[in-house]
Regions:
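Surface-exposed, low-hydrophobicity beta-strand/loop segments enriched in small/polar/acidic residues
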Residues: 1-153
């Protein structure tokens, strides 16, 4: 069966070495104390994220040539919606979607030894296996599923 050409961002599938693979994530703030604006960018599950000088995180954008090292891969978030509903979401809808004076938390797969699966936007030569690669896009996704549409370029 042939592979399906459908972008889905980065999916962690194992860790290098011989350690337990629990697909663990760590929590990072998307805003502080509900008072700072926080990220207005949409971030989808499978999107690469970077740390900001403010202590928050944000989506990386087109990552090749960036000056900020990758923090990890966004795996979802929790926040209080504007109607007061506690919400777990596969994507971050931006600060405007959360209730004022509340905090939002992102969950990021940030193990530096994690290995990921990602779709390519075309055929790759065998020499590309286990090599570094550029992202064709990292800043798109679908709000319906909450998943990134990032893929290799």
């Amino acid at each position: 069966m042939a592979n399906i050409d459908a972008a889905f961002g980065l999916r962690p599938y194992e860790r290098s070495g011989s350690n337990y693979n629990n697909q663990g994530v760590n929590a990072y703030p998307l805003n502080f104390d509900g008072s700072s604006a926080g990220s207005t960018s949409l971030i989808w599950t499978g999107s690469p994220v970077i740390p900001l000088a403010s202590g928050l995180i944000d989506i990386v954008g087109n990552a090749n040539g960036g000056t900020v090292p990758l923090l990890g891969v966004f795996m979802g978030c929790r926040y209080i919606a504007t109607d007061g509903t506690p919400t777990w979401s596969a994507y971050w809808p931006g600060y405007a979607a959360i209730k004022s004076s509340t905090e939002a938390t992102a969950f990021v797969a940030d193990n530096p030894h994690a290995l990921y699966v990602i779709n390519a936007d075309g055929a790759l030569p065998d020499a590309a296996l286990f090599a570094n690669a550029n992202l064709a896009t990292a800043i798109t996704g679908t709000n319906t599923s909450g998943y990134s549409l990032g893929e290799l370029g």
